[in-house]
Structure formats: structure tokens, C-alpha cells
Amino acid sequence: MSYLLDPSRKTITIPKLQAMRDAGEKIAMLTAYDSSFAALLDYCGVEMILVGDSLGNVMQGQQTTLPVTLEQMAYHTECAARGNQTALLLTDLPFGTYPTPEAAFASAVTLMKAGAQMVKLEGGDWLAPIVKFLVERSIPVCAHIGLTPQSVHALGGFKVQGKTDAGAAQLRRDALALQAAGAQVVLMEAVPAALAGEITQSLAVPTIGIGAGADCSGQVLVLQDMLNIYPGRKAKFVRNFMDGQPSIEAAVRAYVAAVKDGSFPAAEHTFSA
């Protein structure tokens, strides 16, 4: 199938995302790992497409994202980039590929040459020098804080972050430090909704939430989760958008609409402190 985009749809750039955030217009983001789904998401009006290392879970059947390699991320980025026309395409730097600023830059260059327009890194304020190094060298960055799946063993499992006073204070420091280092987007995962809303208000850049409440600038889900086709455990923050829909396209459009009108995430998809 060939998707004919609305000719009025403009290419989504970092300044466009910032303008959406400033205007209070919600940003819809989903994952895609191949050309066909990237084309469909773009056609349905998704502003950001993430080639996530979650492909380790939903494409490879891994229990964690840790086994995913840079070469695999580059391959899937190339595939998704061929299908995407206007959405902003970002790609995860996989586990172990950004221990130093220089290593992070080399890894990011590989992904940018494969078609990524931004890279995503997981971590806290300790990442600031790496983010600064990348941004100074024209690599756009999305900083991922809160529950960082690459740290699953260090965190003791997939647990909500920022529930204690100390944990909340650390997330506030993380967000501000990463913004100051130059991150153009901050993604928060599994963070109490009130805290995520507070952090969003404290930042000048857009925030994207996954299990972080409705007050973030936008939302993201793993495509296979929101289509209810992943056989693993369903996280609390996931909603089945295929329910009652006649097609995958309709489900994706329902997701975009729900993000835009603020009906997703609802209270049952969020966490409290």
C-alpha cells in the first residue's frame, strides 16, 4: 500500500516540536522498526517515530533491551527512515555504546548516517557531559530519565522511579542538568504523574511521557503494546488502541487523537507517589 500524505503536513523539526510545546499542542510519538510501519505512522500524523531498543523485546523476543547491538539499531533505523517522510525520526543508543563522550559521538554518527535525526540516551545528570559533547557536534539529543530499561538490573527490575523525596529530587536535578547540557527533548518513563508535571513545568524543552501522566508535552508507546500484539506482560501505562477498531490505521489514528485531546493517558495509566 502506498500512503499519500496530506500535502499540508510539514516536516516535523526540532523547532516545530518546540513550537508545539510552547503552544500547548500535544506531541504524539510511537515506535517503528521497519519501513512499512514507519510509513503508516507518518501517514497517520505521528510527529515523532522512535526506533527503540525495545526492538529487543518485541522483535527479537529478548527479556531486556541489553542484548541489542549498534549494528542492529542502525539496520532498523535505515529501514524506518526509508518509510518515513515527515515525522522526526529518533533512535536509541543501545546499552554500552556511550560510556564516554567520544564513544557516544562515534555511535551517534553511525545512527545519524543510517537516517536518525536525533538520538536518545538513558541516564541521569551524569550524562550531561556526554549530551553536551554530542549537541556541540550537531547531534540532536533526547534524554531519557526515570525508569531506564538499560539499567533494569541496577534498578532491581522495572519499577516506578521518583516515589521517594530523594528520588524525586534526583529526577528534578537530572532533567535540569540534561536540559542545560543541550538536550532538546526529555523523555520520562514510569514517573509519578504529579512529579512529571512539575518537571515539565520547570523545563523549557518538550517532555515526552510513557507512564508519566498527562501533563507531559507528549506521549509515547511501543507500537506492539498499543496494538495489543506483544505477548509479554502489559505495563500499567499501556492502553489497547486496537480495541473496537477495524484496522491498525484506525488504531494509530485513535492513539494520535487521544494524545491530542488529552484523554490518554487516563488515571488508570498513571502512577502516584
Curated annotation (Swiss-Prot):
Oligomer status and interactors: Homodecamer; pentamer of dimers.
Cofactor remark: Binds 1 Mg(2+) ion per subunit.
The protein, known as: 3-methyl-2-oxobutanoate hydroxymethyltransferase
Species: Cupriavidus taiwanensis (strain DSM 17343 / BCRC 17206 / CCUG 44338 / CIP 107171 / LMG 19424 / R1) (Ralstonia taiwanensis (strain LMG 19424))
Reactions listed under catalytic activity: 3-methyl-2-oxobutanoate + (6R)-5,10-methylene-5,6,7,8-tetrahydrofolate + H2O = 2-dehydropantoate + (6S)-5,6,7,8-tetrahydrofolate
Subcellular compartments: Cytoplasm
GO CC, alphabetical: cytoplasm
Gene: panB
Role: Catalyzes the reversible reaction in which hydroxymethyl group from 5,10-methylenetetrahydrofolate is transferred onto alpha-ketoisovalerate to form ketopantoate.
